[in-house]
């Protein structure tokens, strides 16, 4: 293939993986991340990259935005059209195309330092060693020699079914195009078969139960070796792994294996193979240490133990429950200690379930048994290995944790004793038989194994994975399939291999006899080959469930073939989930119908709340500008329509209560109706219920999530609220369903709706009607604080107002009304609409940007541009906080002096290390660091600011440049430095704890009270040491950002530049990424090499 054609194909593959296109400055980096090389546009005869791209219009579509930014998009072609089908293909006879669904969920980032960073254990600093770090990895010196610096972890971890060796069209089948497909649900097969939860599944041919029962139990089977991939040289890989393990008889961490593999064989070890080790007992033994963490230990295979297990008809476990890695006795140590001493040590360790430091053993031993501890015991810990498990820290024999060994089952002890006295000749004979069985499996790839073990389906680790909803019978058992590289894309590749295997092998014939529960390969419609399990059998037909798709079908026996074991290494892709918030109505036919119509055949982003056997999830439709909570939408869709308020145009309504007025002039009203009366009665019953019942833990909200409806006690009454945003485990935002008020509260202040009232409460629709004043002059423009204040003083919480409806906007959910007070009804010339336009309230003052006075004792609080003011959140909302506010936030216009600023944050001295987090990175010459040790304190402060300012009064302040304030940015309150005042009502601020520059509405700026001035400002401007460049290109800046932004790193301080203002301090540091197990990546070395490579290309 010509180089130009190859570059075009690789370029199309890169662009097809980015639905929203790739900005021109980022294209080189994206291309290199996939291919390892730059786009060689100069070698192809073009002076610039853009010139080359414009020369291949069949591959690239170029668009230029209004701001001048150039974005590249992929052009479709027949050769790569099937790439789009790699996303969760739903096999059925009828397919329909629908709107494309984007499931890149815009997750609300509430704790960037924890949710987006790595755990503290990744930083090799002794003060932050967690159980993970202690039990998992050695603790060497913080930094190693810089000559060993650059170690880059591959971004993409390949699936067992995503391996290829050619560069033709087939080579691009593993490039997933995710979250774009709407699948058909017309051809549903019934009866619906139950599918397994995502846990360990064993399927037996001898099973006689129905599918629904069969998939929820575990049947132990002999271990069979399923190949990870049949396009890969698996035998060679397995032999190499054997060689590595033989060199490490004491075991090796599974996370370190790829590093050793690459060092020895100069090749990358496919990441998918790491998941197959548990199914290779003839290659290795896998153990999980009890010291915590997710890493596993690998040992050379124990052939004789495996041998007994393979031939044992009683399915006895292979070995005792694995403990931590044990180190053999050290040379030169004394002989084994007395049995009574070991027995006492074993009894002592039983009392320490979390383990006991070896150094603490003598004292604990003497205190318990009142006898002297043997002097040489600690020098020979290995001799205690037969009575306890020993976990050496950092390979240091002087530092170890001792764990009590778990007792073996009685039948296992007896069996091992019998085996120990067995005849050597019998052992040799059985071992010979085992070798013959192993050889026969290797010789015949067509051999069908009657008993097959399929690995369990693992829940994706990413924050918001994508799922395709297949079908549901109730909301507690929704059949889904995960969409992604290791799931739907891997399955597509496997099915292509199945098609090739069964279509081109004439020796394979259909099954003659089948059993319920047996796994088969079925030739389905459109010449597709699918994995299926037998549910029932008839004379010439069998009923099967397609285990990767979740639906059932009757097929002819002539289309069913024995499933080759090599197609069993991929987990069954269809699984179940439970929709959060809908449990109480899970079987309601109306709810099931609504959920099915909104979800089946579509792809959604999913928030996994509880990773149980059947995960508890919230589905989000992210195809539009805003994320739509599907769970909440379905719940609102089944409300009792007879309890809704249906406003009629030109109708008059009296006794209307204005419950809320937002800062943009939007009103929320309550209109007397049947639903409001029923709600009042129900809330009174709940009040009596809580008054008579002792408050237990079941009444508190233990698992908050967006869209959940619960209760909040406000001004002596219980009110309905819906959670709209979860900031952290302590603080969240709620909206009062029946008044429209939005505020922030503590999780501990919420209560679950008692089960006996839950169904009735959910059925009542929200009673707050969103309105706006009709026929206001267009010249009014943006509402001024004075106009909002006048409207609040006039009608807020007035229960006998009247409205006349002029228009109902169904799409926006808002009614245009004329509003009247009791004195002025029904004269339209004296309506609130006319009065507010005649008043002198619309002059935008230059020096005052915020309303000055509260509207009275019952006046509520405002919250950002959409924060309503309601009696529900007035001064009595949280009395203790309001008292503090009144004392600390007095009326004044002068800014706080610099003497009231917190002390500067502590930085290490030049030449010393410190753990840091990088929240913002522009380029190596400018980025921001935060001390890792202070992040928890910052999290607590942010939560307190959310709760504090959500109930505080808006203050009349004259803001000044270069002064410190509190400002609300994206639903969070930050400590900011005001950098500039714009004429359009916005101000420019600098976040003093995160180092970001933002534009916010001036109404969201408040004084920073003393209680939030104690913690030093956390953001420190930094520059990368060890690299020189006067001007950084966008490409180099992006590479730098990708390696450091939102990551915890180790910083070696070179210079600290002090300044009187804490936000003007600067530090010059070396940055080191210590996340890899054996390599410290010095960022300045990496950037230097990158600049050299870039200069070669240019």
Swiss-Prot record:
Region Interaction with CABLES1: start-end pairs: 893-1098
GO biological process, any: piRNA processing
Main location: cytoplasm
Gene3D superfamilies: 2.30.30.140, 2.40.50.90, LOTUS domain-like (3.30.420.610)
Description of how the protein assembles with itself and partners: Found in a mRNP complex, at least composed of TDRD1, TDRD6, TDRD7 and DDX4. Found in a complex containing CABLES1, CDK16 and CDK17. Interacts with CABLES1, CDK17 and PIWIL1.
GO molecular function: mRNA binding
Residues in HTH OST-type domain copies: 3-76, 233-302, 337-406
Biological role stated in the UniProt entry: Component of specific cytoplasmic RNA granules involved in post-transcriptional regulation of specific genes: probably acts by binding to specific mRNAs and regulating their translation. Required for lens transparency during lens development, by regulating translation of genes such as CRYBB3 and HSPB1 in the developing lens. Also required during spermatogenesis.
Family: Belongs to the TDRD7 family.
One GO CC term, this protein: ribonucleoprotein granule
Protein name stated in the entry: Tudor domain-containing protein 7
Subcellular location per the Swiss-Prot or TrEMBL entry: Cytoplasm
Keyword entries, A-Z: Cataract, Cytoplasm, Differentiation, Disease variant, Phosphoprotein, Repeat, RNA-binding, Spermatogenesis
Modification Phosphoserine, positions: 319, 859
Region annotated Disordered, chain positions: 129-156, 855-874
UniProt disease annotation: Cataract 36: An opacification of the crystalline lens of the eye becoming evident at birth. It frequently results in visual impairment or blindness. Opacities vary in morphology, are often confined to a portion of the lens, and may be static or progressive. In general, the more posteriorly located and dense an opacity, the greater the impact on visual function.
Location of the Tudor domain: 513-570, 703-760
Residues covered by region (Interaction with CDK17): 861-1098
CDD domains: LOTUS_1_TDRD7, LOTUS_2_TDRD7, LOTUS_3_TDRD7, Tudor_TDRD7_rpt1, Tudor_TDRD7_rpt2, Tudor_TDRD7_rpt3
């Amino acid at each position: 293939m010509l180089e130009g054609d190859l570059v075009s194909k690789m370029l199309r593959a890169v662009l097809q993986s980015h639905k929203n296109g790739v900005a021109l400055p980022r294209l080189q980096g994206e291309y290199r991340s996939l291919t390892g090389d730059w786009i060689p546009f100069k070698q192809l005869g073009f002076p610039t990259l853009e010139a080359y791209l414009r020369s291949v219009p069949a591959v690239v579509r170029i668009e230029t935005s209004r701001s001048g930014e150039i974005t590249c998009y992929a052009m479709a072609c027949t050769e790569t059209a099937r790439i789009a089908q790699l996303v969760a293909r739903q096999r059925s006879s009828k397919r329909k195309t629908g709107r494309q669904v984007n499931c890149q969920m815009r997750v609300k980032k509430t704790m960037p330092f924890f949710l987006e960073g790595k755990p503290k254990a990744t930083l090799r600093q002794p003060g932050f060693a967690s159980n993970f770090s202690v039990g998992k990895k050695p603790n060497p010196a913080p930094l190693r020699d810089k000559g060993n610096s650059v170690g880059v972890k591959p971004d993409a971890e390949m699936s067992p079914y995503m391996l290829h060796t050619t560069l033709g069209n087939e080579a691009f089948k593993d490039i997933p195009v995710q979250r774009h497909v709407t699948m058909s649900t017309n051809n549903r097969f019934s009866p619906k078969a139950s599918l397994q939860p995502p846990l360990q599944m064993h399927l037996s041919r001898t099973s006689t139960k129905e599918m629904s029962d069969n998939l929820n139990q575990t049947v132990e089977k002999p271990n069979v070796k399923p190949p990870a991939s049949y396009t890969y040289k698996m035998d060679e890989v397995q032999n190499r792994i054997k060689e590595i393990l033989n060199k490490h008889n004491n075991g090796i961490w599974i996370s370190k294996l790829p590093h050793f593999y690459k060092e020895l064989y100069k090749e990358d070890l496919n990441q998918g193979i790491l998941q197959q080790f548990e199914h290779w007992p003839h290659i290795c033994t896998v153990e999980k240490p009890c010291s915590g963490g997710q890493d596993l230990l690998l040992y050379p295979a124990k052939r004789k133990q495996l041998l007994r297990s393979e031939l044992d008809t009683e399915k006895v476990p292979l070995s005792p429950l694995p403990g931590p890695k044990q180190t053999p006795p050290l040379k030169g140590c004394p002989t084994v200690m007395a049995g009574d001493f070991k027995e006492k040590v074993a009894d002592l360790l039983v009392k320490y379930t979390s383990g006991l430091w070896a150094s603490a053993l003598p004292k604990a031993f003497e205190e318990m048994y009142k006898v002297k501890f043997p002097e040489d015991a600690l020098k020979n810990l290995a001799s205690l290995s037969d009575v306890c498990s020993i976990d050496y820290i950092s390979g240091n024999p002087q530092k170890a944790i001792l764990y009590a060994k778990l007792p073996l089952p009685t039948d296992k002890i007896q069996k091992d004793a019998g085996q120990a006295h067995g005849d050597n000749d019998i052992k040799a004979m059985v071992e010979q038989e085992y070798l013959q069985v192993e050889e026969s499996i290797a010789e015949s790839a067509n051999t069908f194994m009657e008993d097959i073990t399929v690995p369990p389906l693992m829940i994706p680790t990413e924050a918001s994975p994508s799922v395709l909803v297949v079908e549901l019978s109730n909301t507690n058992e929704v059949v889904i399939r995960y969409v992604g590289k290791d799931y739907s894309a891997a399955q597509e590749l496997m099915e292509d291999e199945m098609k090739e295997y069964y279509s081109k092998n004439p020796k394979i014939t259909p099954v003659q006899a089948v059993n319920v529960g047996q796994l088969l390969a079925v030739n389905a419609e459109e010449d597709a080959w699918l994995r299926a399990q037998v549910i029932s059998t008839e004379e010439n037909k069998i009923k099967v469930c397609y285990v990767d798709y979740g639906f059932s079908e009757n097929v002819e026996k002539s289309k069913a073939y024995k499933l080759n074991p090599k197609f069993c290494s991929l987990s069954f892709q269809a699984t179940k989930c439970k929709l959060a918030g809908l449990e109480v109505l899970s079987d309601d036919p109306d709810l099931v119908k609504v959920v099915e119509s909104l979800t089946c055949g579509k792809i959604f982003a999913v928030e996994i709340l509880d990773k149980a056997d059947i995960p508890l999830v919230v589905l989000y439709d992210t195809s539009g500008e805003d994320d739509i909570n599907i769970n909440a939408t379905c719940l609102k869709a089944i409300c009792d329509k007879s309890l809704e308020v249906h406003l009629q145009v030109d109708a008059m309504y009296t006794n209307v209560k204005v419950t809320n007025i937002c800062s943009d002039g939007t009103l929320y009203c309550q209109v007397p109706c049947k639903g409001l009366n029923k709600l009042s009665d129900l809330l009174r019953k709940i009040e009596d219920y809580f008054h008579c019942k002792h408050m237990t833990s079941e009444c508190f909200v233990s698992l908050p999530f967006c869209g959940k409806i619960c209760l909040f006690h406000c001004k002596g009454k219980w009110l309905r609220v819906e959670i709209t945003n979860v900031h952290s485990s302590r603080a969240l935002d709620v909206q009062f369903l029946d008044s429209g008020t939005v505020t922030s509260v503590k999780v501990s202040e919420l209560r679950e709706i008692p089960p006996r009232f839950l169904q009735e409460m959910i059925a009542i629709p929200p009673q707050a009607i969103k309105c706006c004043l009709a026929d206001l002059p267009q010249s009014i423009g943006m509402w001024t604080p004075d106009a909002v204040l006048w409207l609040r003083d006039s009608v807020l919480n007035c229960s006998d107002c009247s409205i006349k409806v002029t228009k109902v906007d169904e799409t926006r959910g808002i009614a245009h009304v004329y509003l009247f007070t009791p004195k002025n009804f029904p004269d339209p010339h004296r309506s609130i609409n006319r009065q507010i336009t005649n008043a002198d309230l619309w002059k935008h003052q230059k020096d005052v940007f915020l309303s000055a006075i509260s509207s009275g004792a019952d006046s509520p609080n405002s919250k950002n541009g959409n924060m309503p003011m309601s009696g529900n959140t007035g001064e009595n909302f949280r009395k203790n906080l309001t008292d503090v506010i009144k004392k600390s936030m007095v009326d004044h216009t002068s800014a706080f002096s610099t003497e009231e600023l917190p002390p500067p944050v502590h930085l290490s001295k030049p030449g010393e290390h410190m753990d840091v987090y990088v929240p913002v990175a522009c380029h190596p010459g400018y980025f921001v660091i935060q001390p890792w040790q202070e992040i928890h304190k910052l999290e607590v402060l942010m939560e307190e600011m959310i709760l504090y300012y959500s109930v505080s009064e808006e203050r009349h302040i004259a803001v000044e440049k270069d002064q410190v304030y509190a400002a609300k940015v994206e639903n969070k309150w930050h400590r900011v430095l005001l950098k500039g005042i714009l004429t359009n009502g916005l101000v420019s601020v600098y976040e003093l704890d995160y180092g970001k520059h933002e534009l916010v509405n001036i109404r969201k700026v408040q004084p920073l009270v003393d209680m939030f001035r104690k913690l030093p400002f956390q953001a420190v401007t930094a520059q990368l040491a060890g690299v020189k460049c006067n001007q950084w290109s966008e490409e180099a800046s992006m590479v730098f950002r990708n390696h450091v932004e939102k990551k915890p790193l180790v910083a070696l301080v070179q210079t600290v530049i002090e300044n009187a203002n804490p936000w003007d301090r600067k530090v010059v540091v070396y940055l080191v990424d210590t996340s890899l197990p054996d390599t410290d990546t010095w960022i300045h070395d990496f950037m230097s090499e990158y600049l050299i490579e870039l200069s070669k290309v240019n």
